[in-house]
Amino acid sequence: MALILSILLTVSPYLARVYEYMPAPGQFVNALPVATAGDTPQTMAAKAEAAIAYNAGKTVCLGAWGGYIVFGFDHPVVNSGDEYDFRIKGNATYASYSQDATRKGGASEPGIVLVSYDANGNGLPDDAWYELAGSEYSSPQTIRHYAVTYTRPNGLQDVPWTDNRGGNGVVPRNEFHQQDYFPLWAPDELTFTGSRLAPNAVDEGENGEHSFILYCYDYGYADNHPNKTDGCKFCIRWAVDQNGLPKDLPAIHFVKVYTAVQQVCGWIGETSTEITGAEDLHPDMPFPDDPSETGLSPMPYANSQPPTAKILRDGQFLILRGEKAYTLTGQTLW
């Protein structure tokens, strides 16, 4: 026990680990972060982690619709109940010019956000996922159970795709980015499933000139509003299950983000969610005393003081209190 206590560290508010990174094809894929022919899913997850963990501030591109990243913190992010719980940083901006003064627009490339609680206590993102119901969740224009398959082209060509609704198209190449747009470490066919939001881009150019404004959705999506606004903040209480019913989670351990729109904006190219970091907005908040309403076991320190420390051991989150150690689901370890 003395050895374990000697290595305890203060938790970081920032994203600490990337578990999976699989972008859809796009003009920044294989560049943000850089991929080589020898890379694997594991090495690319590590590269993505190096780019955005602990507030590193670099950029990870998710590519066209469906491309995703799964990340976590070095501690559970607690559901505050009535406040924003975490933020996801991207590179969205507001334009100083737009024809629609009733809403914000500029460079908004929204990504759908899902969260997961480590119910089995193994430190891996293999439990149920719950979507955070953003402003477009109930929109009749949102397509559920959508699927797209991208196929690797021969050589440096546009990347073709087909969907499960009879649609098809390409992720087009452009003169600005000359690398391969299809993930080098991926199989020759990539299929993604999820929900697709309505296109948010409007061409407001005049006299034959193109000028695309990508309008922001109200709330609940990554890379949708600039980082200094509340629009990049999220509440765990927005979580819903696969039937759209609210899911009361005491905390979350993992976050998944995927590009939510399938559109191409002329010379700008495909719309692609970018991630530059994530932050717990209340990292010192104690775990709730009684999460029993979620179906999870009450914590062993219910109705007492919060634990003295939280650590990660062999991929598993532990809670230490006195000389006892527990998993986050209440299993006594010693």
Language model features by range: what are they?
Residues 112-114, 324:
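Beta-strand signatures of extracellular beta-sandwich domains
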Residues 295-334:
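C-terminal outer-membrane/trafficking sorting elements
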Residues 120, 136, 332:
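Residue-level detector of flexible, active-site-proximal loop/helix-junction positions
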Residues 2-5, 78, 118, 260:
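Residue-level marker of positions within ordered structural domains that often coincide
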Residues 2, 6-11, 286-304:
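Low-complexity, Pro/Thr/Ser/Gly/Ala-rich linker/spacer regions in secreted
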Residues 116-122:
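Short loop/turn segments immediately following beta-strands, especially the blade-tip
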Residues 10-111, 128, 133-292:
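A domain-level signal for the mature, folded cores of soluble proteins
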